[in-house]
């Protein structure tokens, strides 16, 4: 059981990047990995649950090893090697864009007594935004470290951050600011 009411969500970071603009997103994702890893270490030190929630890539299995194997290629290998979950982390699969849609995430967060989520991952303008929207609908407090999300374009990422701040009342911050609190 968590000692805090916060949890770190890591969305879709186990990814094959084999889609339109996948190469662009992979390059942007490489830049956020160190920030997410730093935040992950901070979460571990503070005993916050670390929850990976990921696309299933047609496998429909919550077996992280199979998903990692399915996603590993020249474009994704370095990212997956660095960011992969460890045994102490939670791992859930999702069928669509939101981490809440048709998943056990809300039940898990309730069981862990989490009321504040820090959302990281990709793509900021799709899966992170939809997850933040559904978190808002469930009355979670939301923090988005802007150096821990990436989208296909900087404009799309900025638009998503603006929406999350102005419509979903998410706190937009940085990994460093979260650690300094």
UniProtKB/Swiss-Prot annotation:
Its EC number is 3.-.-.-. InterPro entries: Isochorismatase-like_dom (IPR000868), Isochorismatase-like_hydrls (IPR050272), Isochorismatase-like_sf (IPR036380). One of its GO terms (molecular function) is hydrolase activity. It is an enzyme of class 3 (hydrolase). The keyword GTP-binding does not apply. Keywords: Hydrolase. Belongs to the isochorismatase family. This is Uncharacterized isochorismatase family protein YaaI. It comes from Bacillus subtilis (strain 168). The gene is yaaI.
């Amino acid at each position: 059981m968590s000692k805090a009411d916060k949890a770190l969500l890591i969305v879709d970071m186990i990814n094959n990047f084999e889609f339109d603009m996948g190469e662009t997103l992979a390059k942007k994702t490489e830049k956020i990995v160190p920030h997410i890893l730093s935040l992950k270490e901070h979460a571990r030190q503070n005993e916050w649950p670390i929850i990976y929630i990921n696309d299933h890539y047609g496998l429909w299995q919550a077996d992280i090893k199979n998903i990692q194997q399915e996603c590993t290629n020249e474009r994704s290998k370095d990212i997956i090697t660095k960011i992969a979950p460890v045994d102490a982390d939670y791992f859930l699969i999702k069928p669509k864009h939101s981490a809440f849609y048709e998943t056990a995430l809300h039940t898990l967060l309730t069981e862990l007594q989490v009321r504040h989520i820090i959302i990281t991952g990709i793509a900021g303008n799709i899966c992170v935004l939809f997850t933040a929207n559904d978190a808002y609908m469930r009355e979670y407090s939301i923090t988005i470290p802007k150096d821990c999300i990436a989208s296909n374009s900087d404009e799309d990422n900025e638009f998503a951050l603006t929406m999350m701040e102005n419509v979903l009342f998410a706190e937009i911050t940085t990994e460093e600011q979260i650690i300094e609190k």
